[in-house]
Amino acid sequence: MGNAPLRPILITGGGRRIGLALAHHFLNLRHPVIVSYRTEYPSIEGLRKAGAVCIQADFSTDEGILAFAEKVKSTTAGLRAVLHNASAWQAEKTGTSLSETLSAMLQIHVNAPYLLNHALQDLLRGHGHAAGDIIHFTDYVVERGSDKHIAYAASKAALDNMTRSFARKLAPEVKVNAIAPAMILFNENDDAEYRQQALNKSLMKIAPGEKEVIDLVDYLLTSCYVTGRTFAVDGGRPLR
């Protein structure tokens, strides 16, 4: 008998930055990948050409989230992992609706993972002990808070807590962990002054790039024991 086909890894928000890097990493390993995307960046076509299944999704409504889940179910009978990378970064600003800001942050960071984890759990289960994974991408601000991004920080804190609840619910078949990054890589338009200020906030004084996160994801996927934990990738910021 031949080996069973590899189950795809689902990455939400796979069109940019860390999500895009993770998608290419697994594709380079010849592992099937499904990505969600909101905006048709040129990178999405590159992922298609590399072999990824790319599904446009609107996570701003529960209906959009559940419709995406149905598309995933119609694409594959099983999943190796779900990496919840889709995110938005919205600040409280004068003249904007505070309730709308909070609702938007909760929708993308809490409702989407919550509904997708429930909707897709059967695709992750049934493959053996610790054979499935869910990884939530939270944020360093969960630990320290943020005076300019209160709703964002609160929504990521809810996602962090949800990690432990889903770990309890889905063990031992599925491991559920979180990664809390800070300043992994800069944007192209970040000026030199901003970059230096950001680097000074950590003990390690670098922006390590996507590989630091990719290596941690690889570790979590290969572990048969680690679940319900949050892994800080912040260069020692809390110690400053």
Mark where each language-model region is.
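Conserved glycine-rich cofactor-binding loop
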Residues: G15-R17
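Short, small/polar-rich loop/turn modules that mediate ligand/substrate recognition or access, typified
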Residues: E173-K175, T227-G228
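Catalytic Tyr-X3-Lys loop
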Residues: L98-L115, I135, Y152, L159, ...
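Amphipathic alpha-helical dimer-interface segment in Rossmann-like NAD(P)H-dependent oxidoreductases
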Residues: E70-S74, I108-H129, A167-R168, P172, ...
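C-terminal substrate-recognition "lid" of short-chain dehydrogenase/reductases
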Residues: G209-V233, P238
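Conserved mid-core segment of classical short-chain dehydrogenase/reductases
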Residues: L66, S87-S103, G126, K148-A151, ...
